[in-house]
């Protein structure tokens, strides 16, 4: 068993624009929110050990077993000492959209893992080159009925990305009483 100390960190900011601000005014929305979050994982000496990183063989602790059990679909590169990435979200809100009692909130989010591969599942799980984009819309009817629909596309990071073919659509409906 190998034990290494890990340092993780993140910094984020949220910007909320009101009706009279230029962004909502340009979009014709009532408000808009922009969220930025950047993070990192530092594990000194991680690249010196056969630590599994996130990826197709991430659940198999022995790198030789990972290569054998995944039929050679693996990468000999292990976790990196430093890995980092960022996330962005933008969502304008339209109260009483189209003259109805609905509030519509379209959104777009972006993920980009810039550098390094995080070790194991207990860290922030950065995978160098991974990108993800989501577009969606939320509908709120007088804070009683709510519905959401979104599509997520995951790409980048080549064969190291176990989720490259897992684009998905998500839908939900809820009622508050």
Predicted segments with their positions:
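Short loop/turn motifs that connect adjacent beta-strands in outer-membrane beta-barrel proteins
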Residues: 18-34, 95-105, 144
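Extracytoplasmic loops and strand-loop junctions of Gram-negative outer membrane beta-barrel proteins
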Residues: 68-75, 119
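Membrane-embedded beta-strand positions of outer-membrane beta-barrel proteins
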Residues: 34-38, 90, 106-108, 137, ...
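Transmembrane beta-strands of outer-membrane beta-barrel pores
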Residues: 17, 38-44, 92-94, 110-116, ...
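Membrane-embedded beta-strand positions in outer-membrane beta-barrel channels/transporters
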Residues: 10-12, 87-91, 132-136, 170-172
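Outer-membrane beta-barrel "beta-signal"
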Residues: 164-177
